[in-house]
Amino acid sequence: METHNHDVPWESAYGYVQALKHGDTIYISGQLSHDGADLVAPAPVENGRATSFEQMEAQMRQTYVNAAKLLERFGATLDNVVEEVVYVLDIPAAFAVAGKVRKEAYGRPDPQVASTLVGTNGLAFPEQLVEIKFIARV
């Protein structure tokens, strides 16, 4: 098996790898909107909860960028993705931007990717609005 990480503090704190290739399948752990150890477009938080979903699009874009970086380390691209699961704090906010962001990320008007959108009440960091896991085939 081949593995890759982003080398961010929460990998060792939680104890996992960002991506793992087994055979011809690449499994990408839930990706967040970060650039190194810094969160990108963090949502405002009050009492441990996001108070606005206005950064959904920016966070979603960075999440696809992070997935693409991992795939590149295996010699793959987002074109190799066969399935994604999108976890969000607010389904209407995500649905409003997901089509546009996904089409741009995959570079086509009809991404050939099985996709599931799931609403959840929390993610790894309270500032996060979206997390996406991927499966790719090479």
Model-derived segments and their meaning:
Residues M1-V65, K69-V82, V88-V138:
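N-terminal presequence-like segments and the immediate start of the first folded domain
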